[in-house]
Amino acid sequence: MPSFDVVSELDKHEVQNAVENAIKELDRRYDLKGKGSFEFKEKEQTVLLTAEAEFQLEAMIEILRLALVKRKIDVKCLETKDAYASGKEMKQEAKFREGIDKELAKKIVAHIKDAKLKVQAAIQGEQVRVTGKKRDDLQEAIAALRAKEFDMPLQFNNFRD
């Protein structure tokens, strides 16, 4: 029986490259030179942004987003927390999310059921397995999921006939 998996994954190496590109861009920007820094924590997949003022943090977030787009990483996976003061500096944390949580998985399954396609969707941990009798039905399910905007980027892998 044909099936595929709906997942949300990040290429960690590309994320690291994007953060390094953002650091280089920060050094090149005259208005931010020496006033801010990015600190990438690879294990937690977070970036700590430090600047003198909140408007500089906003500019740094925009630099990071542009670097992600250049590396073909969807910016929906970047979750920014509120800025906070730490001494004379402002700090903000940005976290890279991956994996489909239960709430999003339920939305995906509900969307597939609402589309009234001849497929079944089942939640399996951090992925959703979609099975059907025909390959065409699965391709319709992929098209239906791509047409709807979810708050996480979705990838389709493990397509089997």
From Swiss-Prot:
Keyword Calcium in record: no
GO cellular component: cytosol
Coiled-coil zones: none
UniProt KW keywords: Nucleotide-binding
A Pfam family per the record: DUF520
PANTHER family the UniProt entry points to: UPF0234 PROTEIN YAJQ
Matching NCBIfam families: PRK05412.1
Protein name, as recorded: Nucleotide-binding protein PputW619_0959
Organism field: Pseudomonas putida (strain W619)
